[in-house]
Amino acid sequence: SDLENIKNKFVEASLRSVRIGFDLIEIHGTHGYLFHQFLSPLSNHRSDKYGGSLENRMRYPLEVFASIKQALPKDFPIGMRITGTEWEKGGIDEQEAIIFANELEKIGCHYVCVSSGGNAPNPKIPIAPHYQVHLAKIIKKNTDMVVRAVGMITDPIKANQIIVDKEADMVAIAR
């Protein structure tokens, strides 16, 4: 099937990454990409085992992640970027993100990077410095996962404070 083929391609790409010397793998599960499309009730209108309930919507991303994890060397670090909220009624919310992060942890995910949005046409995103840090904090508080915060974090002093305040374990700084 197409889904099985895509899963195999992810496994193959992950193994190539290890072979050429990558230090870790992060699966992109947000911003409207494939796994986000499965996870989001805004985009997933399937009526099979991959649609409907949160359990079903998580199924394919978890299957692919588990297949990658199983193929990698035993302690090779692998994480996933997840959506903390879609900023849209009826979309992924913090509670679903917590459940998904806990399910990832059960299958050996080493960390999650908590982002947001990406699937709604007109989300009401309160964009400002550090606007997604509270999402990382929510995931950190409700899971045992290592959590990375993102979102307009450009000041190294603030980045350090996020870690000191235990809002996240890691901080991504870019742009």
What is the predicted role of each segment?
Residues S1-R175:
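Flavin-dependent oxidoreductase catalytic cores
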